[in-house]
Design a protein with these regions (language model features):
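A conserved active-site cap/scaffold subdomain adjacent to cofactor or substrate pockets
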Residues: 204-239, 246-284
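Internal metal/ion-chelating core segments
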Residues: 138-235, 240
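A short secondary-structure junction motif
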Residues: 70, 113-120, 190, 232, ...
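A helix-coil-helix interface module used to build multimeric assemblies
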Residues: 1-173, 178-185, 248-252, 262-268
């Protein structure tokens, strides 16, 4: 499940209450008041989605309104910058995990199809011209190998960026004795990220750059595989016939004997969109 910004702001505040209470930075009365305030804000947002804000500077006034100004001590040693960075990394981490799961499903389908067609012989092409016979399994495993490399890159990203920016404040850090190790653990990270400047200025950008580049690589491999299939499907005597019906193919509105590869077209278009969106990420 991919959670939104409001969810993660709430989680960060809850983690701050627990961690700061353990470190005696909050007395028991203030900690309970802050916790009740966070729950109240969550309940208000559940009843009115317009209150499901995406920025901490809009969230904090709602907590103050539900409790009182004394709860602002919770923000000591923090900044909207380390909160924003933590929120972005946490959301991108969930999105990356979702991408891993989707890619696993694709790889699993390819491997199952390869197992089914170990002895199926098909033509392979270079420069659009039939070149050599090949087993369909071997051909499919070539694409599986490419997707597995993409999967490995995603794993590496998840490991590399599963470090928590929270508690870095902004730029030069803080002298307020926050327990960043506890904060990282409570938010599901392996450890805190060490350099405060990196935490708030570079980490969320780098994570987005790496994941978008891997997503684009997946898009290129998807496009390559679909192109091969569509070239064969378009021939007068294709050796690949798409299963009809559903979203897979649709009947031409003018030529009822014609079956257009709808799902292939849409998927290829989506893959191209991913590659173009990667360019946008690198341009920002």
């Amino acid at each position: 499940m991919i959670h939104d910004e409001f969810y993660w702001i709430s989680q960060i505040n809850k983690a701050s209450v627990v961690s700061n209470s353990e470190e005696k930075l909050l007395d028991e009365t203030t900690a309970k008041l802050a916790a009740r305030g966070i729950v109240t804000v969550e309940q208000q947002a559940e009843a009115d989605t317009s209150k499901r804000v995406k920025k901490y500077i809009a969230y904090e006034p709602m907590v103050i309104a539900a409790t009182g100004p004394e709860v602002t001590i919770l923000h000591a040693g923090r900044s909207s910058q380390d909160i924003l960075s933590t929120m972005r990394v946490a959301i991108l981490r969930e999105q990356t995990i979702a991408l891993c799961e989707a890619l696993d499903a694709v790889i699993g389908k390819i491997l199952a199809l390869a197992e089914e067609h170990r002895d199926t012989v098909v033509p392979n092409y270079t420069n659009g011209v039939a070149a050599q016979p090949n087993s369909y399994a071997h051909y499919l495993l070539g694409f599986a190998a490419a997707f597995l490399r993409d999967r490995e890159r995603l794993n590496q990203c998840l490991v590399r960026y599963n470090e928590c920016p929270m508690g870095a404040t902004v730029l030069n850090g803080t002298g307020w004795p926050l327990n960043r190790d506890t904060m990282a653990k409570l938010l599901g990270f392996d450890r805190p990220r060490l350099n405060a400047f990196d935490c708030t200025c570079e980490t969320p950008v780098d994570f987005a750059l790496e994941v978008s580049s891997v997503a684009a690589s997946i898009g290129v491999h998807v496009g390559s595989m679909i192109n091969d299939i569509m070239v064969q499907y378009a021939q007068s005597r294709p050796w690949i016939i798409l299963q009809e019906g559903g979203e897979n193919t649709y009947v031409s509105s003018a030529m009822p004997q014609k079956r257009n590869p709808g799902l292939m077209n849409y998927c290829r278009g989506d893959a191209s969109d991913v590659v173009s969106e990667m360019t946008a990420v690198f341009t920002l």
